[in-house]
Amino acid sequence: MSKDYEVFPLLLEMAKRGCLVAPRRLSRIEILKTLGLTPWRFKKLVEAAEEEGYIERRVHGRMVFYVVTERGRALLRRVYDDLKRTIDSSTFLTLRGYVVPGLGEGAIYMGIPRYVEAFKEVLGYEPYPGTLNIKLVDEDVYLRRALREKRVGFRIEGFRLDEGRESCGVTVYKAMIMANGVTVSGAALDIDKTKHGDEILELIAPVRLRDELRLKDGDKVEVVIPV
């Protein structure tokens, strides 16, 4: 496999210059400049690619033509698929944690009509009046902090309550919440002012998550957030 990735840049450059379609003459000087190769290194890579069956050299008099074989095309496709899979998976952030008892803060927010209306506007549904709390594994606490920097959530600003107190703002991240082989569409909350540390993530959904996901304290939960 290491040899595959050594010859891949050369193979890709040949493909870009038409060698996937038909045998082509190539400017060695241009390829050396593009790939930053020495003549000796270029010679070794061509030999390696030919030995592995990725390219063929066809000599006509003093002219040399190169063509990428079906085996070479398969290598290009394999690397492309690896890159696409890696890039596509990077459009989601997965946070892992374990169910812990809550402090009742979520129920307070869910009981304030203005918050409920804001959640309905952002999420398209009225959340169950309460949150599920999970304690993130250590490495995912840092991912949560990185999530804030991406600014991909929906912002609900704080406002003044009837009794004169100020409510705090909250950022809402749409999410898929998964546990015990069940997936529920919900959201993760990042509340501006909370008694919890960054290791505690509060989740909401249109249903009671403990019931829908058959959860008890200590159960593992995964939260997948588009970024």
Curated annotation (Swiss-Prot):
The gene is ribK. Its EC number is 2.7.1.161. It comes from Thermofilum pendens (strain DSM 2475 / Hrk 5). Its cofactor is Mg(2+). CDP binds at G102, L103, G104, E105, G106, A107, V207, R208, L209, R210. Mg(2+) binds at T131, N133. GO terms for molecular function: metal ion binding; nucleotide binding; riboflavin kinase activity. Catalyzes the CTP-dependent phosphorylation of riboflavin (vitamin B2) to form flavin mononucleotide (FMN). Keywords: Flavoprotein, FMN, Kinase, Magnesium, Metal-binding, Nucleotide-binding, Transferase. Belongs to the archaeal riboflavin kinase family. The keyword Amino-acid biosynthesis does not apply. Signal peptide: none annotated. The keyword Flavoprotein applies. This is Riboflavin kinase. It is an enzyme of class 2 (transferase). FMN binds at T194, E202.
